[in-house]
Amino acid sequence: MMIMAKIAKNLTELIGGTPLMKLAGYSRKYGLQQDIVAKLESFNPAGSVKDRVGLAMIEDAEARGVLKPGATIIEPTSGNTGVGLAMVATIKGYHLMLTMPETMSIERRNLLKALGAEIVLTDGMAGMAGSIAKAKELRDRIPGAVILQQFENPSNAKAHELTTGEEIWRDTDGQVDVFVAGVGTGGTVCGAARALKKHNPDIYIVAVEPASSPVLEGGEAAPHRIQGIGANFVPALYDASVVDEVIPVPDDEAIRAGRELASAEGLLAGISSGAAVYAVSYTHLTLPTNRE
């Protein structure tokens, strides 16, 4: 009888440990001399970096005793955090309610429903502020309900400090000069930055935000088309002390760079990934030759 020693008990055990890949085709196309390496978070079970956050926030709430078995989790989100939370909540037996503007796509709603989430739509004109208010109203009405608050929850950034950053350091054998990430909640860039700078304080950390809404640099909040980053406010988790540079990326350039990852690498990536790649390849950011 064959014994399978590495069979996961459930999908939560497959979160993290995502591979790194050199963007060799993209680098050749633009004559870039440095090694640009992408961390393929799409290899997570629900398809994004937010799987890490969903698991971390739920396990943290369990450990603190605020989330009881079978309880209701509420979160205002229209993005991949909702997908990650839905997957983990289903596995762990929680009821998940997601509040989001009615302007969100039918496809996104159907995906979340398929994963077991209950969708509560709010006035589209009120944006995410309306969804946040609705989440608080539901929490106050439902006994034992918990809002995980991804923009404020320290376990969000801690997940990236303990996993994402450490994985990058390990899998590059410490050959990292610059780390670039978009800012939505701020958890990825700041958490990973803390881990990397513990190993080497000279690693240069770049935060990416939409040029249309450059709030991290003190600019005015405004609509933009880079889904997944640019919350139009400075998140509580964003720690400017670990960020060396903020690069604003135009919407059209982020979209184009995302498409070029597909044509140059066969890599299907979102607009926020395109923004990060643009920040590396279309700015004055300089990296030492033959380093990541």
Locate predicted features.
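PLP-dependent amino-acid enzyme catalytic core
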Residues: M2-L285
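Single conserved hydrophobic/aromatic residue that forms the stacking wall/gate
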Residues: H284-E292
